Curated annotation (Swiss-Prot):
Pfam families: PSF2_N, Sld5. This is DNA replication complex GINS protein PSF2. It comes from Kluyveromyces lactis (strain ATCC 8585 / CBS 2359 / DSM 70799 / NBRC 1267 / NRRL Y-1140 / WM37). Its main location: nucleus. The GINS complex plays an essential role in the initiation of DNA replication. Has a role in chromosome segregation. Keywords: Chromosome partition, DNA replication, Nucleus.
Length: 201
């Protein structure tokens, strides 16, 4: 089945979220799934395990001992009240202010935010708001400020677009995906003009 043009040259927001939800995320479990030899000897029926493709972490969790699981599983456990999510170090008010300060002082460069910062911050704000030390409404505001400043830089950077490439470093997957259809369309037209001029010379 042929895809619409906007989907054939990029990802949908749902596809991007699906990809990012497979990224490792640190949690603080509230439950213990690891079974000791004593427990197994006392109760052979205790040899149950959670169904998962990779049980190295999920079936070896100890309450209040941090571990890494995929983001989607962290969100599921959080929804069930079985863990707290450890907020990434870059998603604090102090760190976001540093990123914003860098963006404002360097009009031609992007700060080295994680490639998934937009989606991760959105998911954690919506589903793990009680795990943040800083007020979530202030964090949302900083993230929005960062997004707007970086979007302005992207639009400015498009003026350097040519028929062969466009170099904008440290953009996130979502930011690249949003500009890709427009940039690809312009590059196709520039390439056509470039090829036509070469044919006439």
């Amino acid at each position: 089945m042929a895809l619409p043009r906007d989907l054939s040259i990029g990802f949908s927001p749902q596809e991007i979220q699906f990809l990012i939800e497979n990224e490792p995320t640190r949690i603080m479990p509230r439950i213990t799934t690891r079974k000791t030899k004593k427990q197994l000897a006392k109760d052979p029926g205790a040899q149950w395990s959670l169904i998962t493709c990779d049980d190295s972490t999920v079936n070896n969790m100890v309450a209040m001992n941090s571990c890494e699981v995929t983001l989607w599983l962290a969100l599921l456990l959080k929804q069930q009240g079985k863990c707290n999510v450890v907020v990434p170090s870059w998603l604090t008010l102090q760190q976001l202010e540093k990123y914003l300060d860098f963006e404002l002082k360097n009009p031609s460069r992007f700060s080295n935010l994680p490639w998934n910062w937009l989606v991760v911050s959105s998911l954690l704000f919506a589903r793990c708001s009680d795990d943040f030390q800083d007020p979530v409404h202030l964090l949302r505001s900083k993230v929005q400020d960062l997004r707007e400043v970086r979007l302005g830089k992207v639009n400015k950077g498009l003026q350097y677009l040519n028929e062969s490439h466009l170099q904008l470093e440290n953009l996130s997957l979502m930011e690249i995906n949003e500009m890709r259809p427009y940039a690809c369309g312009i590059m196709d037209k520039l390439r056509t003009i470039h090829d036509s001029s070469n044919d006439t010379t």
